[in-house]
């Protein structure tokens, strides 16, 4: 593949390492679900899914119907959980056709699925979601027994799992997380009291998985951790994870500008002395947030260089003072390792007051993904 002005490198060995770290950590009795929604957090869903399954993942999770179809069209046969809400007959028919396993969040949705599947003459495994405190998708946890009982009575549905999602698993204060676990336990107890079957249970995302075995149940759903990032600093010692994604771009022009020269839109940066600068072929249309303008450092020859002026749609400028004889075509590292130095998505997220998930998902498809 031609290395264009900018690209994303995906370290397959690092991904395999991370999957195996989680596989060993949760043990053989707990299923490992690789969360590959949002194009595997910007890493490329098909390749990541294939690699994760080969390395020891048991299940895949996606958020939309289209994401699931993409995996099936690539020949992936592993079980796929669709996390998002589905409520149209056309989508239900497609789910059945592509052998995806949907999340059901309400009795009304369960009835709709059963009605459509009855017309199709198909039976489908389904996963019931309880709201234990996220206040997003799901049936309120006190109604768990009624919900499970209804699904058990619907002939076209096969109960595959019961799960919930944690709102604060990455917070050092675990009070809310523990409250959600207690509610999940009470919901399970209500099934036993009603003499209903207990299906596969899962509660943990990456952060909760790293909290230990008490959170693992029958399966864990690991997203961010697979890609080598920790959900929170206090969880950084739990496993040895390696970042999978690197973002690089080429220098497309080098210039020397005199004192008093404004750089880029709005002249947010004005040179105080004669200085060398470079234009780098990557911008906010590629996923470099414009709000990082004049706050970003990138790596050139393993040395940090400062980004200057407003980041534009397709390009940005960097200060080359301190770099000896720079050349057009040299490669700049925006995220990743160069020599002894490393820049992570966490660095960008901290500067912007956001989360690393958003940074990773922001890298657009016009940046080719190169497997290394």
UniProtKB/Swiss-Prot annotation:
Q: Which reaction does it catalyse?
A: L-alanine = D-alanine
Q: Give a Pfam family name.
A: Ala_racemase_N
Q: Which Gene3D superfamilies match?
A: Alanine racemase (3.20.20.10), Lyase, Ornithine Decarboxylase, Chain A, domain 1 (2.40.37.10)
Residue spans crossing the bilayer: none
Name the enzyme group at the top EC level.
isomerase
Cofactor entry = pyridoxal 5'-phosphate
Return the SUPFAM superfamilies for the record: Alanine racemase C-terminal domain-like, PLP-binding barrel
Extract the PROSITE patterns matched here: ALANINE_RACEMASE
The UniProt entry, under InterPro entries, shows: Ala_racemase (IPR000821), Ala_racemase/Decarboxylase_C (IPR009006), Ala_racemase_C (IPR011079), Ala_racemase_N (IPR001608), Ala_racemase_pyridoxalP-BS (IPR020622), PLP-binding_barrel (IPR029066)
Give the pathway listed in the UniProt entry for this protein: Amino-acid biosynthesis; D-alanine biosynthesis; D-alanine from L-alanine: step 1/1
Q: Name one GO cellular component term.
A: cytosol
Domain of life, source organism: Bacteria
N6-(pyridoxal phosphate)lysine PTM positions: 37
Q: Which GO terms describe its molecular function?
A: alanine racemase activity; pyridoxal phosphate binding
Spell out the catalytic residues: 37 (proton acceptor), 265 (proton acceptor)
Q: Which CDD domains match?
A: PLPDE_III_AR
EC code: 5.1.1.1
This protein's UniProt keywords: Isomerase, Pyridoxal phosphate
Detail which positions bind substrate.
136, 313
Homology family: Belongs to the alanine racemase family.
Task: Write out the function statement from the record.
Answer: Catalyzes the interconversion of L-alanine and D-alanine. May also act on other amino acids.
HAMAP family noted in UniProt: Ala_racemase (MF_01201)
What's the protein called, per UniProt? Alanine racemase
Specify the species: Synechocystis sp. (strain ATCC 27184 / PCC 6803 / Kazusa)
Q: Which gene encodes it?
A: alr
């Amino acid at each position: 593949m031609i290395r264009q002005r900018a690209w994303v490198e995906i370290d397959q060995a690092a991904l395999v390492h991370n999957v195996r770290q989680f596989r060993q950590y949760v043990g053989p009795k707990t299923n490992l679900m690789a969360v590959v929604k949002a194009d595997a957090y910007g890493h490329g869903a098909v390749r990541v899914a294939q690699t994760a399954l080969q390395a020891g993942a048991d299940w895949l999770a996606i958020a939309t119907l289209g994401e699931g179809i993409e995996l099936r069209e690539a020949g992936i046969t592993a079980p796929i959980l669709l996390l998002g809400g589905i409520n149209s007959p056309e989508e239900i028919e497609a789910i059945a056709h592509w052998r995806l396993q949907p999340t059901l969040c309400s009795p009304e949705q369960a009835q709709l699925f059963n009605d459509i599947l009855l017309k199709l003459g198909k039976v489908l495994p389904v996963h019931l979601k309880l709201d234990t405190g996220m206040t997003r998708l799901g049936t309120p946890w006190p109604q768990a027994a009624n919900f499970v009982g209804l699904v058990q009575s619907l002939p076209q549905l096969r109960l595959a799992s019961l799960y919930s999602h944690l709102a604060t698993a990455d917070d050092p204060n675990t009070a809310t997380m523990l409250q959600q676990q207690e509610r999940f336990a009470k919901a399970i107890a209500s099934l036993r009291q009603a003499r209903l079957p207990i299906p596969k249970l899962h509660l943990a995302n990456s952060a909760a998985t790293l909290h230990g075995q008490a959170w693992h149940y029958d399966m864990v759903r690991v997203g961010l951790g697979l890609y080598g990032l920790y959900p929170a600093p206090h969880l950084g010692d739990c496993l040895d994870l390696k970042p999978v994604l690197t973002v690089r771009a080429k220098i497309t022009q080098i210039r020397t500008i005199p004192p008093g020269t404004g750089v880029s839109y709005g002249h947010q940066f004005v040179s105080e002395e004669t200085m060398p600068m470079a234009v780098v072929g990557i911008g906010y249309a590629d996923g470099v947030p414009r709000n990082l303008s004049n706050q970003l450092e990138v790596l050139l020859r393993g040395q940090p260089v400062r980004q200057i002026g407003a980041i534009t749609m397709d390009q940005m400028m960097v200060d080359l003072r301190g770099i000896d004889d720079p050349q057009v075509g040299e490669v700049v590292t925006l995220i990743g390792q160069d020599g002894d130095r490393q820049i992570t998505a966490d660095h960008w997220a901290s500067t912007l007051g956001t989360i690393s998930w958003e940074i990773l998902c922001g890298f657009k498809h016009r940046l080719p993904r190169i497997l290394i």
